[in-house]
Amino acid sequence: MNAPAAFESFLLLDDKKFYIEKDTKVPNAAIFTIMKEDHTLGNMLKIQLLKDPEVLFAGYKNPHPLEHKILLRIQTTNNTTPADALTTAITDLVGELSLLEHRIDAAIKKCTQSGDQERGYN
């Protein structure tokens, strides 16, 4: 079979995880290559970046289904850099995911407690 081995989709051998390339076609833009990632991270970052008023453009693509990397293109205003916008987006995403985790844990705890009460375990 011509497909790469399954472990190649997540195991980062001697390669870097992250590359930055200045985009010379448009002002104040950069292309970030993130290795061993897919649409899950790409779409979350794109949506979070587009919430920032300093970001003029944010988009990503997976060059080929058998290549496990995403290319994230960011263009910002002159007030910030693409790297700063990405850092802010990642920080905001971590906060949102922490809040989601807390809410899920609270809901599970509430369900298990109500289930225990219905069964007469308390």
Curated annotation (Swiss-Prot):
Positions of transmembrane segments: none
Function: DNA-dependent RNA polymerase catalyzes the transcription of DNA into RNA using the four ribonucleoside triphosphates as substrates. Component of RNA polymerase II which synthesizes mRNA precursors and many functional non-coding RNAs. Pol II is the central component of the basal RNA polymerase II transcription machinery. It is composed of mobile elements that move relative to each other. RPB11 is part of the core element with the central large cleft.
Gene Ontology cellular component list: RNA polymerase II, core complex
Subcellular location: Nucleus
Designated name of the protein: Probable DNA-directed RNA polymerase II subunit RPB11
One term of GO molecular function: protein dimerization activity
Quaternary organization: Component of the RNA polymerase II (Pol II) complex consisting of 12 subunits.
Keyword Transcription: yes
